[in-house]
Amino acid sequence: MAKFHKLIVLAVAALAVSATLAVAADRKQAKSQVEFGIRVAAQGLWREAIYRWERAAELDPTYPAVWNNLAVGYEQSGQFEKAKQAYEKATALDPHNAYIKQNFDLFKEINDRANRANPR
């Protein structure tokens, strides 16, 4: 019985280690997609950037930079509701990130100003 218990403990430990390695691999792949998205966004290729950042979000939905970059991309492509949702997700994941907060505050200010100028 003790031998069986040890085998179960070892199996659970191995599963935990493999899950941790999978998460680290996902973050690494997500980071690669984020960086590629930044490069193509700098060239004005916003659809490609959004595609890369959406792929990164699939790989690692807990990565705040993904959601911040997606929000910026959505803003650039006129998808303001999606931008707002992405900023909210980024803020929820990293509430103390000054860069995300600054981007979201600027988005809200511009969006509010546009809505006041052109009420529906």
Where are these regions (language model features)?
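Conserved structural position within tetratricopeptide repeats
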Residues: 55-58, 91-92
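Register position in tetratricopeptide repeats
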Residues: 42-43, 76-77, 106-113
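Helix-start (N-cap) detector for alpha-helical repeat units in TPR-like alpha-solenoids
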Residues: 30-31, 64-65, 98-99
